[in-house]
């Protein structure tokens, strides 16, 4: 499991503020002595969000926020080459699979006291664009014990030309309607830095 920080490239980078999210994956090594395995990745990135104060009831007895989030979901599979079998393991990998750019809207209400919890409704999706993406990157694992290690990586994500929204593109109108003011259409590629925990599961037999 890893935390990720992304920076968009070209027009996508100029329109968005960068993103943050999480990545989970597993690499299957068919041989205990081999250096080539099969990598599976699942990643989720939020590349923009905004909150709009609103009344959650009529009359306005309960106030809250409408939260807009711009997201990327991606699944990838491909080869991984580990260059060393010692405690320090540099590696290279490439994956390909489906990815989606989608924008959601949900209502959020928080209590007035500091220790009150916040509640959110299930998000509604107002725009989505599925397509094929591929990643190419490399990293370094440092195993500080037999089972656990630190994983650092840097990746180029290629999504190609996509339709997507950025902050301010989804309009919340005074009459209660929701419209898309500006649907963006451009290349939407990114550079991604990840830091996380690596768990090593030994092979028996």
Please state what every model-predicted region is:
Residues 7-13, 49-59, 102-117, 163-170:
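Outer-membrane beta-barrel translocator domains and adjoining extracellular loop/strand segments
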Residues 14-20, 67-74, 124-133, 185-189:
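Short sequence motifs at beta-strands and strand-loop junctions characteristic
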Residues 29-33, 84-88, 143-145, 202-204:
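Outer-membrane beta-barrel channels and translocator barrels
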Residues 136, 144-205:
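Predominantly the C-terminal beta-signal and adjacent terminal strand-loop region
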